[in-house]
Amino acid sequence: MTTVDGDTIYEYDPLDRLIKTTTPDGESTSMTYDGVGNITSSTDANGNTTQYKYDGVGNVVETIDALGTSAFFEYDSMGNLVKTRLHRVDTQDNVDEWEVTLYEFDGRGLTTKQVDALGNVTTYAYDGNGNLVSKTDPDGYTTEYTYNALDLVTKINYNDAKEVSYRYNKTGDLISMTNWLGTTTFELDLLHQL
């Protein structure tokens, strides 16, 4: 089956899975699937193919890009990503493990800590609704987030004392944003579109 959205062409297999997208300028991307519907490969407009491998519950456990770089993903029993490892294979088939990232989660499955290959730690804190309320980067800079009753962010405070605030109408549409450079106002039509 083939459908057209504007000038972009979408092609589907008999199981209604997207297998090819062609843009108006003729660039195409394509995908292949396994028997349970997982994407096994994707090819971009430049012909670069990435392969995907899965565990028994459908989590991506490995990707291999066109340059031979492999990424491995490990999950906890709740399905949360807890570790990534990147490996590169050189022209002599030597494997170089060059980046490992570790993740920690709270009981709700929200990321609370990320440790990169150099030991740099980023921490995250959340409110009772699961909204991110603070993020502290490896340099100790903290960004804080404030939300309204609809769980929409109303203010972001950056470590350097800069602040961004957001205003919404009664239906939750963003109507203005104010930062250290000034205020931007958004006008919406009856369909709530800019």
Segments (PLM) and residue ranges:
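Beta-strand elements of repeat-based all-beta scaffolds
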Residues: 1-23, 27-44, 48-65, 69-116, ...
